[in-house]
């Protein structure tokens, strides 16, 4: 089976994007893993699939597969790549589109300066809906947020727990560059209190309008940027009284801009999307 693809990235978070409107695809988890492999495949953090919509009132269906072959609910940086792809391929002539995902509808739009803004919807703040098992835990309040203790290697990490369509655990660190992201990230991802696993964010506060962030992504490991992780970190920081919107998020792959007006308001994610190359692969 030969598949045409486009390699893209958003702030270094890289993707293989596949048009499933004009070609038929039927991949196994092993084939997704092969496609993501940086030595034997194309190489990517996630694979993004463009499909015809199934729901009424939307323009496209957006599906996301992690490097481990598992399908996931949401990817903010990928949403920007998705918009650039459907625009460049002339699959739409709209500046703003409605896109169906596993976790609901998102509304990305192409800005005049070439940046792309994605309305990521309102965060989910109820632990049980993330999901996160709070049984037997004693939480503490910080500002409007609730912090939960998580035991990692015998040490207590105080985390914010929320969902941006996918689950996130966010903690504040003194120095993001030297935080044990890979060592602790995998333990947080697979912690038994997260039945669907979790994305682990390590946030350093620079000032009230700027943070440095590293994210260990569920099913992908540490990536150069994570859009939903940036949104989750900003929501956590604002609710804790540490940040004020808008916020610049420095990732290892570039800068993202996040705006959030508070509980029940949508989180707006703005950043770049870049096409690297196009190709064809036999699977």
Swiss-Prot record:
GO terms for cellular component: cytosol. GO terms for molecular function: diaminopimelate epimerase activity. Keywords: Amino-acid biosynthesis, Cytoplasm, Isomerase, Lysine biosynthesis. Its EC number is 5.1.1.7. It is found in: Cytoplasm. It holds the Pfam family DAP_epimerase. Its main location: cytoplasm. Signal peptide: none annotated. Pathway: Amino-acid biosynthesis; L-lysine biosynthesis via DAP pathway; DL-2,6-diaminopimelate from LL-2,6-diaminopimelate: step 1/1. PROSITE patterns: DAP_EPIMERASE. The keyword Ribonucleoprotein does not apply. NCBIfam families: DapF. Belongs to the diaminopimelate epimerase family. PANTHER family: DIAMINOPIMELATE EPIMERASE, DIAMINOPIMELATE EPIMERASE, CHLOROPLASTIC. Homodimer. This is Diaminopimelate epimerase. It comes from Herminiimonas arsenicoxydans. The gene is dapF.
């Amino acid at each position: 089976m030969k598949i045409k693809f486009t390699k893209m990235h958003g702030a270094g978070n890289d993707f293989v994007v596949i048009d499933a409107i004009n070609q038929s695809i039927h991949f196994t988890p092993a084939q997704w893993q092969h496609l993501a492999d940086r030595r034997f495949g194309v190489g990517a953090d996630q694979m993004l699939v463009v499909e015809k919509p199934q729901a009424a009132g939307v323009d496209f269906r957006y599906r996301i597969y992690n490097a481990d072959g598992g399908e996931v609910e949401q990817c903010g940086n990928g949403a920007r790549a998705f918009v650039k792809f459907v625009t460049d391929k002339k699959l739409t002539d709209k500046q703003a589109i409605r896109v169906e995902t596993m976790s609901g509808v998102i509304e990305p739009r192409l800005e005049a300066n070439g940046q792309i803004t994605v309305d990521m919807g309102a965060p989910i703040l109820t632990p049980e809906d993330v999901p996160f098992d709070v049984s037997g835990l004693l939480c503490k309040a910080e500002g409007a947020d609730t912090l939960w203790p998580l035991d990692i290697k015998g040490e207590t990490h105080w985390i914010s727990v929320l969902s941006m369509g996918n689950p996130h655990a966010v903690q504040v660190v003194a120095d993001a560059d030297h935080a044990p992201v890979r060592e602790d990230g995998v333990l947080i991802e697979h912690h038994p209190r997260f039945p669907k696993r979790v994305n682990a964010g390590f946030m350093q506060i620079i000032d009230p309008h700027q943070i440095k962030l590293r994210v260990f992504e569920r099913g992908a490991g540490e990536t150069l940027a994570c859009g939903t992780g940036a949104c989750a970190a900003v929501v956590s920081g604002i609710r804790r009284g540490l940040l004020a919107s808008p916020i610049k998020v420095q990732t290892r792959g570039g800068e993202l801009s996040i705006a959030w007006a508070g509980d029940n308001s949508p989180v707006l994610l703005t950043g770049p999307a870049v096409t690297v190359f196009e190709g064809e692969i036999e699977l």
